[in-house]
């Protein structure tokens, strides 16, 4: 999966082939097919790993610098995602897999929804702050918008375009403004 992530970092996930993964890994194509039946399986596996890593960074960030407010938790979440964009090869291309349009959809919940769930659970467990259905939708919307803007911010730069990172924070805050919790 490291070879796939590195290749995606350079070329994007659309151009990724199993042959490229094998070449980058210094392995035969048969070795790749032993673990992954096709290119889609490679993409799904990398997306799953990306989600696991993003959730780990997010949970640690919320634990270490979490906030007692929804807005503060979103700020921490965007910073955590920026860290993952900067440190995980290929993350800027595939992110947590929500960009993949593979039918039928394997799960009703996407990666961004899982990120929103972690934020909600942190607020509920650590702060006793219960979010109603409107607030939960607002958090998911904030994460979807932040993901889209961060994807643009890191499209051409490993460090990210600071104006788009700031915009991701600003717009995610707008998504939850006025939400009662």
Residue ranges and their predicted role:
Residues 59-64, 94-103:
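Short linear capping/connector segments at secondary-structure termini
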Residues 63, 83-94:
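Charged, amphipathic alpha-helical coiled-coil/dimerization segments
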Residues 2-6, 10, 24, 41-61, ...:
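Alpha-helical structural segments
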